[in-house]
């Protein structure tokens, strides 16, 4: 429980800046790292060990979770001094009916600071309260020793505050592999194709979702019974929108102590 609330607070602090940098594009909140762990590690998360936010970063990690059930919530304020009511809310849950498969669900709600609508003479016609949301359902399963795959279906809805409402569907596909190289050391590899699907149509032309391909690797080193170190690196290729197409990369490290404290950087 302490870890749960600590993740909420850290996520709020670390992710305010990334959200500010991407909120200009259609459904850009889908590109925001929702959890404190991978955000603190430079955004690298596709090859990390499983936790509840694996439902979003790579659902193929979930069959290897040590817990049968998990639930989490993160709150990410955006430019609080300028837009006090703008934030991204994320909730995720997963369940493992057995040791080989997992089902997951998540919900993201991005509320934006509203503004007044006026006519040419300055008369107030109403208030705009734009918001976006996405709801996911995923299924993951091990297909060989150390290897799992996942498929996630996503519904995306965007309401700019006018009568126009844009909505579409997309999917994520993930792959995860882990291999023990010693009694307390292992390596993991992850791949994810995210937000592959339709476009948002606001009535004045389509706007593409942020299609991305991610691949990464991680090394988990058990330094002792109470201490551990994880090193990870990840590369990402953005396919759409076409004007943002290109490569990016991230890397990070995590030091764990007694299972209750983690120091991360990236």
Specify the residue positions occupied by each region the protein language model found.
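Bacterial N-terminal signal peptides that target proteins for export
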Residues: 1-9
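N-terminal signal peptide c-region/cleavage motif recognized by signal peptidases
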Residues: 17-18
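Subset of outer-membrane beta-barrel
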Residues: 24-266
């Amino acid at each position: 429980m302490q870890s749960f609330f600590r993740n909420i607070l850290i996520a709020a602090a670390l992710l305010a800046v990334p959200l500010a940098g991407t909120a200009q594009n259609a459904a850009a909140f889908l590109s925001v790292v929702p959890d404190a762990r991978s955000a603190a590690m430079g955004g690298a998360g596709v090859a990390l060990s499983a936790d509840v936010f694996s439902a979003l970063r790579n659902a193929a990690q979930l069959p290897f979770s040590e817990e049968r059930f998990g639930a989490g919530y993160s709150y990410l304020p955006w430019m609080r001094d300028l837009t006090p009511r703008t934030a991204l809310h994320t909730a995720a849950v997963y369940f493992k009916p057995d040791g080989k498969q997992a089902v997951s669900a998540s919900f993201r709600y991005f509320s934006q600071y509203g503004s007044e609508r006026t006519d040419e003479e300055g008369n107030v016609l109403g208030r705009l309260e734009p918001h976006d949301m996405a709801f996911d359902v995923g299924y993951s399963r091990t297909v060989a020793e150390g290897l799992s795959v996942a498929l996630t279906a996503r519904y995306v809805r965007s309401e700019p505050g006018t009568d126009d409402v844009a909505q579409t569907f997309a999917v994520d596909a993930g792959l995860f592999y882990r291999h023990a190289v010693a009694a307390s050391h292992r390596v993991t590899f992850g791949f994810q194709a995210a937000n592959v699907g339709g476009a948002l149509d606001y009535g004045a032309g389509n706007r593409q979702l942020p299609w991305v391909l991610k691949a990464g690797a991680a090394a988990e080193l058990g330094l002792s019974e109470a201490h551990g170190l994880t090193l990870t690196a990840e590369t990402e290729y953005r396919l759409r929108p076409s004007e943002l197409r290109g490569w990016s990369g991230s890397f990070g490290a995590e030091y764990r102590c007694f299972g209750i404290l983690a120091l991360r950087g990236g």
